From Swiss-Prot:
Residues 16-26, 578-592 have a biased composition (Low complexity). The modification N-acetylmethionine is found at M1. SUPFAM superfamilies: SNARE fusion complex (SSF58038), WD40 repeat-like (SSF50978). It comes from Mus musculus. Disruption phenotype: Mutant mice are born at the expected Mendelian rate and show normal body weight development. However, they display reduced sensorimotor gating and impaired motor performance. The modification Phosphoserine is found at residues 573, 588, 592, 598, 762, 764-765, 770-771, 792, 799, 811, 819, 821-822. This is Syntaxin-binding protein 5-like. Phosphorylated, leading to STXBP5L increased turnover and subsequent de-repression of insulin secretion. Phosphorylated on serine residues in response to glucose or phorbol esters. Ubiquitinated by the E3 ligase SYVN1, leading to STXBP5L proteasomal degradation.
């Protein structure tokens, strides 16, 4: 029977009645609840587009997690399967194998993982968590599941040990007791080793928690128990008594056996190692302080830092390895965390970049009574995982195939590109491989377990991450993997900061002045653009050849002209009478002269960073073509950039901030437009004026309130952006409420590129304020506050109270009058979205032309027309004319994204220039012609044609028809929340709008009708890291930074959810357990006990009895038989109820059938009698009746 899907019914109802929504668009629901209704389409002929997407195409599920496990706590290794497991403080477990085998699983409780133990070659894993619960994980499936859990109620777990090929797990507790758990049934045995029986009766003090458990390699019936206070007990399991006891003055941290079972080594809190012989337990056989200073004979060695762990591994043909962490001398406080390797008389200290959490020695054999033959050491650091090769004398490290260095510098932004040009990955890899670090071990990565294949998903994917130190990393994300391709350092463009220069020249940000804020990449043309936190934009071009050249830089002065706002000139002048006068002579081939003014002198017209003035050698790859910097204005640093876009076809880059918009021609290296946001509207007003050119170096009076007035209220205003990226660049993942995080800095905050700095407030007073006037305003009086709160939900800020008369509706009257008082009353609008496209700039346009869509934080959309030279030759010499078209569109909330569709409903891609190597000496630039790809049909230029423009803000989405500028569809996405990220993506060859809301909802809407396809409460927003890094891409995929060190990928495609099992790797592969070595006749006779030890007979219920029920509680896991029985029972119950309902329905149908049969019999009888009556009176005349 075909499955009935109620969502199809809803899709059909929505499609059949698109105008059923409220025309007012009012909605009281939260995110994901909204109304879809057509706009004003009366009398407008509209082509109905057949949409192919339905709700069956969408489903949300997580796919894979990349990066280093955040806050690691435990490490385990299976020497036969060769897989590695890492536990974290948040209850997560990452299981790693060969490249492509990377699995993430999570404890539901979220408790920290204390210890991990593999059931070697059994496809299972035991985890002990901080809530005193043991879990058994099944690894014989691609998504590991918990089979059993055992919750200890009265004791806290401190240590676990599972002997090789044993089904009995030893569990040590904080009280000093040792319990035994059956792995198969996960039931506690009645056999318990109490601490008071393990120590001598004469001892009155508690030995402390159990810190070590291990069975003797020589005799499985003997258990070594280590207590924290320095006591070691050798327990005979059969006789249930202590065979010997060892006492030491210093606390014990770890113990390890010699493979022969005659000696064991302990590490202590005073930095010493003690070697004990079972034949003479009264005192240590050997005591050493590896890093202590040598003392005179008879004196105790100098105490050192604790040795937290030691491993004692033997080799057949060489001296044993003694490997330990810690133990350095106290007088070397500046020394970094270290791992010491002692091999014979040689001592090697490996210094680490981060504190050591755990380490394990990887050995050839799983049997503890054989020569271990160690070949590598896996070292788990707080922020890294390294593996040291022990087979080479210099102990090199293996090259890590996993992307464990995503957080090498904190991630500040991300971008995700699916279905890229296929040659890009090979090109980037071939360039990046030349710059890889050298000195790695020449052997293969030792963690090589599991199995993985490419699966059905073969299209190329690239992830780009921007970092706090200015680096940009390109990653190959194809086929559910992540591998480094290429690394770009943007800081090489600038001069290095001197010791005393940083505070003076870079007051915009206190730390990380090169932090990457936004990235824009065109894969087809290979043009790459990046904006930094210090208000700069760098344009990179890709080249296969090395070049040495000077870096071209432009300095742009972007400010608010108060005089123009307050006193409009009465005469009317054309907005752009002479474009050549608009091109400022700010092209600087020698770099910027960033000279710091002496103390007390107002800074003006200097950038935050200094571009290198000397010729710079640029290796193959991305090479800087142009640097654009915003400069200080009258002592005020430039505002951070909030939006960025570039067009390789037009040769134009545009960016904006809270002050205004800048448009630059990067072919001719000239500034085309530098205009405040308010001037974009004024260009269509009655009082039209020529906008200020950046080259006009006007000196404003010191009492200019527009740019400096608020500094009187906040003296520390110059420190305003120091906390902008603090929460993103610090690796402390302390949860911060969204409202507090967004308002952390009272002077600047950026959510999704929306700047909310109060320094960008415009002045609405009718006169220029003097210093005395400003001091009066400081008192606030009964008049209006000096600045207001922006109404956009994504632009929260700490500001003064908002008065009623200052509240502005998010609607905009298209027929604007010459008065701009309503705009003057508002805070300045930030440029939040930019988009280049061939479109209709005005209502009366009959053909498409190059346009720039500009979206603001107050929901306004301004179309700017770009008039380009007609030929390629003129493009390098003739100026580009940039004219605001006078077309305005409006939405609720800050504008987030744009996109266009042609009249057939196909998504239109912005035009681009085909890539060519700018440094190719074989081509003559003068004879070479630019190859442009225009992604629209020739029929779209015909008279009367139109296109659909999709605009999404943080509150709603609208679809406009151009050039008529009629709103066809409106969808009010949310009223109580706001959208953080929105993008128009391609799914199954159809376009749809994907949105991520602040309250965790992911919503998908079809285009152009904006019908809801999916609304899932996926992820509650707990910190701004997710908001800043969440991004959608084509083919139903998305990603975000789930922790400071990890990237989480997810899919909203039903097809990918169905095929996810085929894309993941197998953790378990059938491998025969290696056979134990033959010990020989003499070793078997004299080397130790040769008798077998039956743990089942000793620990089973028959001999040991049952454990107390109150001690531990057994919890069946979802993957266990009990869990499956429960689920099956639930299914059977549902089937039973369905069968009963079916029987009742069948009974009613039977009764109805009987009634129907009776009615049919009556009808036949009536028909028969009627026929007989007709025959009786057929031949009679009327007068015979």
């Amino acid at each position: 029977m075909k499955k009935f899907n109620f969502r199809k019914v809803l899709d059909g109802l929505t499609a059949s009645s698109p105008g059923s929504g409220s025309s007012s668009g009012s909605n009281s629901g939260g995110a994901g609840s909204g109304s879809v209704h057509p706009g004003g389409t009366a009398g407008l002929p509209r082509e109905e587009i057949q949409e192919s997407l339905t709700s069956d195409y969408f489903q949300i599920c997580k796919t894979v997690r990349h990066g280093f496990p955040y806050q690691p706590t435990a490490l385990a290794f299976d020497p036969v399967q060769k897989i590695l497991a890492i536990g974290t403080r948040t209850g997560a477990i990452r299981i790693l194998g060969r490249p492509g085998v990377d699995c993430y699983c999570q404890h539901e409780s979220g408790a920290a993982v204390l210890q991990l133990q593999f059931l070697i070659n059994e496809g299972a894993l035991v985890s002990a968590s901080s809530d005193d619960t043991l879990h058994l994980w099944n690894l014989r499936q691609k998504r590991p599941a918990i089979l059993h859990s055992l919750k200890f109620n009265r004791e806290r777990i401190t240590y676990c040990h599972l002997p090789f090929q044993s089904k009995w797990l030893y569990v040590g507790t904080e009280r000093g007791n040792t319990h035994i758990v059956n792995i198969e049934s996960f039931i506690l045995s009645g056999y318990v080793i109490m601490w008071n029986k393990a120590i001598e009766l004469s001892t009155k003090t508690h030995p402390g928690p159990v810190v070590h458990l291990s069975d003797s390699p020589r005799d499985e019936g003997k258990l070594l128990i280590g207590y924290e206070n320095g006591t070691v007990v050798f327990w005979d399991l059969k006789s249930k008594r202590a065979e010997l006891r060892v006492y030491y003055d210093e606390a014990i941290h770890s113990i390890d056996w010699h493979h022969e079972g005659k000696q064991f080594m302990c590490s202590h809190s005073d930095g010493s190692l003690t070697l004990w012989n079972l034949k003479s337990p009264s005192r240590p056989f050997q005591t050493t302080v590896p890093h202590g200073k040598s003392q005179r004979e008879g004196r105790k060695s100098e105490s050192c830092k604790p040795i937290l762990k030691v491993e004692y591994k033997t080799c057949r043909n060489s001296e044993p390895f003694i490997i330990f962490s810690g133990g350095l001398s106290y007088d070397k406080a500046c020394r970094r965390p270290s791992l010491t390797i002692m091999h014979g008389k040689a001592i090697t200290v490996l210094e680490m970049d981060h504190p050591i959490v755990e380490f394990l020695t990887l050995c050839e054999t799983p049997y503890p009574n054989e020569f271990q033959e160690p070949y590598a050491v896996a070292v788990l650091l707080e922020k890294d995982l390294i593996v040291v090769d022990l087979t080479q004398t210099n102990f090199p490290i293996f090259e890590n195939p996993y992307p464990m260095d995503i957080h090498e510098s904190p991630v500040t932004c991300t971008a995700y590109f699916a279905d890229c040009p296929p040659d890009l990955i090979l090109v980037l890899y071939s360039i990046g491989v030349k710059h890889k670090k050298q000195g790695y071990s020449n052997k293969e990565w030792p963690v090589s377990g599991g199995a993985w294949n490419l699966g059905a998903q073969t299209y190329p994917e690239i992830i780009i991450t921007g970092h706090a130190d200015g680096t940009i990393k390109f990653w190959d994300a194809s086929a559910m993997t992540l591998q480094m391709l290429y690394k770009l350092k943007t800081s090489k463009v600038f001069e290095k900061q001197k010791a005393g220069e940083g505070k003076q020249t870079c007051e915009l940000v206190e730390e990380d002045p090169f932090a990457v804020q936004m990235i824009y990449w065109c894969p087809e043309s290979r043009i790459f653009c990046v904006s930094g936190v210090s208000a700069y934009v760098i344009i990179y071009k890709f080249s296969r050849h090395e070049v040495t050249t000077e870096i071209v830089s432009l300095e742009v002065r972007l400010q608010c002209d108060v005089e123009d706002i307050i006193t409009p000139e009465p005469e009317t002048s054309p907005p752009f009478p002479d474009l050549s006068s608009q091109l400022p002579p700010s092209r600087s081939l020698s770099g910027s002269t960033n000279t710091v003014s002496s103390e007390g002198v107002t800074k003006d017209s200097i950038p935050c960073l200094s571009v290198k003035t000397r010729p710079v050698r640029m290796p193959p790859g991305y090479q800087a073509d142009l640097v654009i910097q915003l400069v200080w204005v009258d002592g005020e640093p430039p505002q951070q950039i909030t939006s960025l876009s570039i067009s390789s076809a037009y040769g134009i880059v545009a960016f904006g901030n809270c002050t205004g918009l800048v448009v630059v021609d990067f072919i001719q290296k000239t500034v085309l437009l530098s205009m405040g946001t308010i001037d974009l509207y004024r260009s269509s007003d009655l009082y039209q004026r020529q906008p200020r050119s950046p080259r006009k170096n006007r000196q404003f009076i010191a009492d200019n309130f527009c740019m400096r007035g608020l500094s009187n209220f906040y003296p520390d205003l110059t420190k305003r952006i120091r906390t902008s990226y603090q929460s993103l660049t610090e690796l402390n993942d302390s949860p911060v409420p969204l409202e507090l995080e967004r308002c952390k800095s009272p002077t600047s905050d950026h959510v999704n590129g929306h700047c909310t700095s109060p320094t960008s407030q415009s002045c609405s007073s009718g006169k220029r304020l003097s210093s005395a006037d400003v001091s009066k305003v400081n008192r606030w009086g009964p008049g209006r506050p000096p600045f207001r709160k922006a109404q956009s939900a994504a632009c929260m800020e700490i500001s003064l109270p908002v008065t009623t008369e200052e509240t502005r509706e998010n609607s905009y009257n298209r027929s604007r009058s010459s008065s701009i008082s309503s705009i003057d009353k508002d805070s300045k609008e930030a440029i939040t979205a930019l988009y280049f496209m061939e479109s209709f700039a005005r209502k009366n346009d009959s053909t498409v032309s190059p346009c720039l869509f500009v979206g603001t934080s107050l929901g306004m959309v301004v179309l700017i027309s770009l008039n380009l030279p007609s030929s390629d030759e003129q493009r390098f010499t003739e100026p580009v004319v940039v004219l605001p078209s006078g077309t305005f569109l409006s939405l609720k909330g800050a504008v987030l994204t744009f996109s266009c569709m042609d009249r057939t409903g196909s998504l239109m891609q912005p035009p681009y220039e085909v890539w060519r190597d700018p440094n190719n000496t074989d081509e003559n630039e003068k004879t070479w012609k630019r190859k442009l790809v225009m992604n629209y049909s020739s029929s779209s230029q015909e008279m009367g044609d139109h296109q659909y423009t999709i605009i999404c803000s943080e509150k709603q989405a609208k679809v406009f028809s151009l050039p008529s500028q009629t709103c066809l569809y409106v969808h009010n996405i949310t009223e109580t929340s706001f959208i953080l990220q929105a993008d128009v993506v391609v799914m199954c060859n159809s376009a749809c709008l994907a949105c991520f809301c602040a309250n965790g909802h992911i919503m998908i809407m079809s285009l152009p009708s904006l019908r809801p396809m999916l609304d899932v409460n996926y992820l509650p927003l707990t910190d701004m890291r997710i908001a800043r890094t969440f991004c959608f891409t084509n083919e139903g995929q998305a990603l975000y930074l789930v922790s400071p060190t990890e990237i989480q990928r997810l899919t909203y495609s039903q097809e990918m959810c169905d095929n996810i099992q085929d894309m993941l790797g197998d953790l378990f592969t059938p491998i025969e357990t290696p056979e134990a070595q033959n010990r020989g006749f003499l070793k078997g006779l004299f080397g130790g006990s040769g008798q077998t030890f039956d743990r089942e007979e000793l620990f089973g219920e028959a001999s040991a009895g049952k454990a107390s029920r109150s001690l531990a509680q057994h919890i069946p896991g979802p993957g266990s038989i009990e869990g499956m029985k429960g689920a099956a029972g639930g299914v059977m119950g549902e089937l039973t109820r369905a069968r009963i309902a079916l029987d009742e329905r069948g009974q009613r149908l039977g009764e109805l059938e009987e009634k129907t049969a009776g009615m049919m019999t009556s009808a036949e009888a009536f028909s028969k009698h009627a026929h007989e009556l007709m025959l009786k009176y057929k031949d009679k005349k009327w007068y015979q009746f």
